[in-house]
Amino acid sequence: MELTSDGNAIYREEPDEEDPWAFTLRPRETKVIFELVKKLDGLRRPIRNDRKVAFTGDKILRYDSGNGQREEAAYVYTEEPDAKTLESWFLRMAESANHLFELERVVRFDRLGVNKTLLYFQTSFDKNRVVASHHFLPVLRKVAGDQRFVHIARARAAALIERIESE
């Protein structure tokens, strides 16, 4: 995941992925993320906690300030609240990308699965786990306006469109 200070982001499943998801965060979302980085002194402050916990993989945060300074923080577990919040933001971005990929897939290949996928997306949306929600509007409009999808999926898509547009 790469994020620039103007809110442009790129999500890749693999480092050499040919077609990553490029998206733009809303200004308020971008501001929150970069304020967290600032609170962590540009990732210079130690955030690693050596408490024995299950190994779930290294989490690596990198910050390039643009003036040649590059900081990196690698950890498995942290108790630093700002680092946890920052990690949560990146997990939310990945979760949002996965929702969009799955929704686009079922719209194209599994019309009967659209309502279930929309329900999962709506659950994440209700729990404030979705970022860059405006990127979902084209596929939601496609579902809401296409009679080939079941009525409940069209109604759910229309309700989600209304909620996203009112944000």
Language model region names:
Residues 1-5, 21-25, 68-79:
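Short amphipathic beta-strand/extended segments with alternating polar/hydrophobic composition
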Residues 2-11, 55-59:
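A short, structured beta-strand/loop element
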Residues 5-7, 15, 29, 37, ...:
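A mature extracytoplasmic/lumenal domain signature
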Residues 8-21, 121-123, 138-139:
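Acidic/histidine-rich, surface-exposed loop or edge segments in extracytoplasmic proteins
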Residues 16-20, 33, 92-95:
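Short C-terminal domain-edge/linker segments immediately following a structured domain
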Residues 24-27, 55:
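Generic alpha-helical scaffold signal
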Residues 27-50:
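Charged, amphipathic alpha-helical segments
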Residues 46-167:
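Short, well-ordered, aromatic-rich surface patches in folded extracellular/luminal domains
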